[in-house]
Regions:
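Terminal accessory/targeting
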Residues: 1-171
Length: 171
């Protein structure tokens, strides 16, 4: 079992990790995002659901939607799920691969191979969910502040691609 950090630490971690999306972080920090308690155990395979974004942010999602872990979104009216989802916990969950870590604690390493996670929802790996959520939070902050995203959060980072190579150590 992996225990989630204190919520204020979790939130600060997310703000720092995704700082390129909000050079000005105050607008995102002020969003009325609920802090949903973490479950005592992570369900495996993870249970996920689609959250429809509001019309003013539908271009950010995949067909206007974001895939989130069920435990961080209540069972409110489907059109209001975006406002009752714990986006900071969702980001932490994705960034840290929480379900994969739990699986590895119980079954050994998967070495980032999703095929070893039989029965898991493949949509988890089909889109850049963290980036989409960060862009959604930028848009939401600008709506709340009645300004542009650039005014409220700063400019988006220039796109860059980093090529890396995964090295495995052996004796």
């Amino acid at each position: 079992m992996i225990t989630a950090p204190n919520y204020s630490i979790l939130k600060q971690y997310i703000i720092e990790e995704l700082a390129p999306f909000w050079q000005k972080k105050e607008g995102v920090l002020a969003l009325p995002i609920p802090a949903v308690p973490w479950p005592k155990a992570e369900p495996l395979p993870p249970r996920v659901k689609i959250v429809a974004l509001p019309s003013w942010a539908s271009d950010i999602g995949v067909n206007g939607n974001i895939l989130v872990p069920e435990q961080f979104s209540d069972n409110a009216d489907a059109s209001a799920l975006w406002a009752t989802t714990d986006w900071f916990s969702t980001l932490f969950w994705y960034l840290n691969g929480i379900p994969e870590r739990i699986f590895e604690l119980n079954h050994g390493p998967i070495h980032s191979y999703s095929y070893r996670l039989a029965g898991w929802d493949q949509r988890l790996w089909e889109h850049a969910w963290v980036n989409r959520i960060a862009k959604f939070l930028r848009r939401w902050a600008s709506m709340e502040a009645q300004g542009t995203e650039a005014e409220v959060c700063g400019s988006l980072p220039k796109t860059s691609i980093l090529l890396t190579h995964d090295l495995d150590a052996t004796k």
